[in-house]
Regions:
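Amphipathic alpha-helical interface surfaces
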Residues: 25, 58, 86-91, 102, ...
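Conserved interaction-surface patches within small, structured recognition/assembly domains
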Residues: 66-85, 95-99
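Structured beta-strand/loop patches that form or line metal/cofactor-binding pockets in enzymes
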Residues: 43-66
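Extended low-complexity intrinsically disordered regions
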Residues: 3-50
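Short connector loops at helix/strand junctions that flank enzyme active sites
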Residues: 55-59, 71-75, 88-90
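Generic structural signal for hydrophobic core residues of well-folded globular domains
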Residues: 33, 97-98, 138, 142
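Structural motif
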Residues: 19-22, 81-86, 126
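C-terminal binding/interaction regions
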Residues: 82, 104-109, 113-150
């Protein structure tokens, strides 16, 4: 059994996907792909600061900043090529659903969130594992950061 709480922004995105037919879900994923912002210069000029998520079928790199403010807000940054719309779309979903949330809320997100989007029949299992790996990598990096502070 997977436990955890889906933050409100991410729950709304999941509901949006679940309210659509399968072809429309794919279109919504493409919309998220197109909306994924470019990296800020501090990362685009220094790609060595990004970590590759090797489980993704297409090249995807991520990094994050964990704030000093109460709750340690998490800010996510992704880089994926335009010719990888599925990967970019998954990154866009995670960015919109999790960016700015306190670290504890991100850590509490259930691991099955990718499956809740209703794309398992339309997207290959390997690509679905890529989104799961993105979420897992985000959580691991948060845990490492919190452990380093202790």
């Amino acid at each position: 059994m997977i436990t955890g709480t889906v933050p409100a922004k991410l729950a709304e995105i999941i509901d949006d996907f679940q309210d659509l037919t399968e072809p429309d879900r794919l279109q919504l994923l493409l919309d998220f792909s197109r909306e994924l912002p470019a990296l800020p210069e501090r990362y685009s000029d220094h790609p060595e600061l990004l970590e590759q998520v090797v489980e993704c079928q297409s090249p995807l790199f991520l990094t994050m900043e964990i704030g000093e403010a109460p709750g340690h807000p998490v800010h996510l940054f992704f880089s994926a090529p335009p010719e990888a719309p599925t990967t970019r779309g998954f990154a866009g979903v995670l960015l919109e659903g999790l960016d700015g949330l306190p670290a504890a809320e991100v850590l509490a997100v259930p691991d099955d969130v990718p499956d809740r989007l209703g794309l398992t029949r339309a997207i290959t299992p390997l690509r679905m594992r890529g989104m799961s790996a993105m979420l897992g990598r985000i959580k691991r990096k948060i845990r490492e950061s919190v452990r380093d502070e202790a």
